[in-house]
Amino acid sequence: MHINVGSVHEREQIEQLAELTGEAERYGLPVLAMTYARGPDIDPEADDYNQAVGHAVRLGEELGADVVKTGYTGDAESFQHVVESTSLPVVIAGGSKGTDEETLSMVRGAMDAGASGVSMGRSIFQHDEPEKIARAVASVVHDDAEAEAALREAGLAVEA
C-alpha cells in the first residue's frame, strides 16, 4: 500500500492505508507502507524536499504502518531528517536506474543517515547480474561496506 503525499489521490490513499492497517492489526500482520512526496506541487529539486518526504514517512507511522519505504532525498544529511521524522524503521526504494556505484552510494548515504535497510525491486531483479548486485547491497547494509569496496567484493566493475 502506498501514499503519495501531494498527489491528487492523496486523500483516497490515506483512507485506504488507514483501512488496511486496521485490518492488518486484527490479523497480527505487519504493514510496510510506501510513503512518497509526489504531486503537482512537489519539487524533488527544492531545498525543502526532505521536509515533504519526512512528512510522508511520519504520516505512514500515524496511519499505523510498521515499516516505511520511501525515496532517497539525494544525500545523507537531508535524508537524516526523513529518518528522524518517524520512530519506525525506514527503508529506501531502489530509485531510478543509475550505475551500480550510484545505487550503492545511495544505499551507503541512507545507511549513514540512519535508515534500517532497503526494499529494492527492479534495481536488483532487472540487473544484468542480480546475485552480484544483491550481494553488494547486502554488504553495504549489513557489513557497513563503502560502495566501491562492495562492488569489488561482489565482482562488479567499478566505474573509472
Per-region residue spans from a language model:
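Alpha/beta enzyme core
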Residues: 1-90, 98-116, 120, 139, ...
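Glycine-rich beta-alpha junction loops
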Residues: 96-97, 124
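Histidine/acidic-residue-rich catalytic or RNA/ligand-binding cores of hydrolases
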Residues: 103-104, 128-137
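A short, acidic, flexible beta-alpha connecting loop/helix-capping segment that sits on the rim
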Residues: 122-128
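C-terminal extensions of enzymes
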Residues: 157-160
